[in-house]
């Protein structure tokens, strides 16, 4: 399994099983509106940090912040019940 798919599966599992102390659980367990707001705030924060890293031309920081951005985007998608396969299919459509 590739790393991105494995991370996505772990996020889905944590949303479903709600293990104590999980960061994903902390982001996703409030009422849906509050949870979505928290996740969107994190996405905005990570997007800004990715932009700043790019402006600083710092490759390692771009990679680090991009991973955070992708992770939080995955949390949002999983919160809405969107599967990794659905996301993958959207990318396949765009390759045509």
Curated annotation (Swiss-Prot):
Keywords, A to Z, come to:
Amino-acid biosynthesis, ATP-binding, Cytoplasm, Histidine biosynthesis, Hydrolase, Nucleotide-binding
Question: In what pathway does it function?
Answer: Amino-acid biosynthesis; L-histidine biosynthesis; L-histidine from 5-phospho-alpha-D-ribose 1-diphosphate: step 2/9
Q: What is its main location?
A: cytoplasm
* Pfam families, per the entry: PRA-PH
Subcellular localization: Cytoplasm
Task: Return the EC number.
Answer: 3.6.1.31
Report the SUPFAM superfamilies cross-referenced here: all-alpha NTP pyrophosphatases (SSF101386)
Q: Does the keyword 4Fe-4S apply?
A: no
Keyword check for NAD: no
Single GO term (MF): phosphoribosyl-ATP diphosphatase activity
Instruction: Report the record's Gene Ontology biological process terms.
Output: L-histidine biosynthetic process
Q: Which domain of life is it from?
A: Archaea
Q: Which InterPro entries match?
A: HisE, PRib-ATP_PPHydrolase-like
Q: Name one GO cellular component term.
A: cytoplasm
Q: Enzyme class, one word? A: hydrolase
Q: Which reaction does it catalyse?
A: 1-(5-phospho-beta-D-ribosyl)-ATP + H2O = 1-(5-phospho-beta-D-ribosyl)-5'-AMP + diphosphate + H(+)
Where does the chain cross the membrane? none
Family matches, as NCBIfam families: histidine_hisI (TIGR03188)
Family statement drawn from the similarity comment of this UniProt entry = Belongs to the PRA-PH family.
Among HAMAP family, the record links this protein to: HisE (MF_01020)
Please state what the protein is called.
Phosphoribosyl-ATP pyrophosphatase
Q: Which organism is it from?
A: Methanococcus vannielii (strain ATCC 35089 / DSM 1224 / JCM 13029 / OCM 148 / SB)
